[in-house]
Amino acid sequence: MSDYLVKSIDKTKNLRLLTITAKDVVGEAQKRHDLWSASAAVLGRTLVGSLLLAGAELTDKEELTVRLLGNGPVGPTIVTAMSDLKVKGYVKNPHIALSPKKNGHIDVKKAVGQGMLEVTKDLGLKEPYTGQVPIVSGEIAEDFAYYLTKSEQIPSAVGLSVFVNPNNSIGEAGGFMLQALPGASDALITETIKRIKALPALSTEFLDGMTPEDLARKILGTDCKILEKDDVAFSCDCSKEKYAGILETLKSSQLKAMINEDHGAELTCNFCGNKYHYTENELKDILAKKKEEKDY
């Protein structure tokens, strides 16, 4: 089953729901960054949550960046999602595995630690907008919900799931984001939350073949309306040309050292792990572009 996101609405048109399956997205991140179990769970949940947030809020060529800045062993987690539902991300420490909790689950809360959750949205305005809330749970889903409720005043419920196999590959990944629209009654919200609490573990459901459409009907009822279905993917827009532009910003003395001492340079993209090698001659060409500039 390919990765995709579904948007739906309940029969009263007062509850909006986004549901997603993202096994391949998280699997690609796991392979690119060689993630161990705890790191895979943290980055995976953040990737899924960021895609749900992008699906709910972005249009045109907008993008958002989620920074989960916890003091746990995984370290900061950075994810960027685009309006076309392409996502990329990384954790500072990819090789973290922790003792499981008593129920056998990965201790995501311990891996994340305490800190802040920041969401920066580039909506094509002069300045990006950043909202910030404390990490209240560390389980990540609750932290996204807290951000939406406190920073954006949108009453929300979020569920995120990543199942990591014993060999660190990804067995499943997915989740949901429920948002109450202004006309939603307390009774409607209460009834829907009861449905969510009655759900079996999302990981079990996705492993058993549940689709985003299935999850939407379980949460909103079988009479909900499916509005939209869109593919999602792990994708990075880095390139050798972009990194050459970064090299051009270095001082001439630094470029000369790379040429004369290192005889080349290799840069690695944090988001996707792609490596870009520059030969001496390529570095000389970059240095030549700077010759008309005043070097400080």
Swiss-Prot record:
What keywords sit in the KW lines?
Chaperone, Cytoplasm, Disulfide bond, Redox-active center, Stress response, Zinc
Q: List the disulfide bonds.
A: C236-C238, C269-C272
Q: What does this protein do?
A: Redox regulated molecular chaperone. Protects both thermally unfolding and oxidatively damaged proteins from irreversible aggregation. Plays an important role in the bacterial defense system toward oxidative stress.
Per the record, the similarity remark reads:
Belongs to the HSP33 family.
Write down the species.
Lactobacillus helveticus (strain DPC 4571)
Q: Which PANTHER family match?
A: 33 KDA CHAPERONIN
How is the polypeptide modified once translated?
A: Under oxidizing conditions two disulfide bonds are formed involving the reactive cysteines. Under reducing conditions zinc is bound to the reactive cysteines and the protein is inactive.
Q: Which domain of life is it from?
A: Bacteria
What is the protein name given in its UniProt record?
33 kDa chaperonin
Q: What is its main location?
A: cytoplasm
Give GO cellular component annotations, separated by semicolons: cytoplasm
Concerning CDD domains, the annotation shows:
Hsp33 (cd00498)
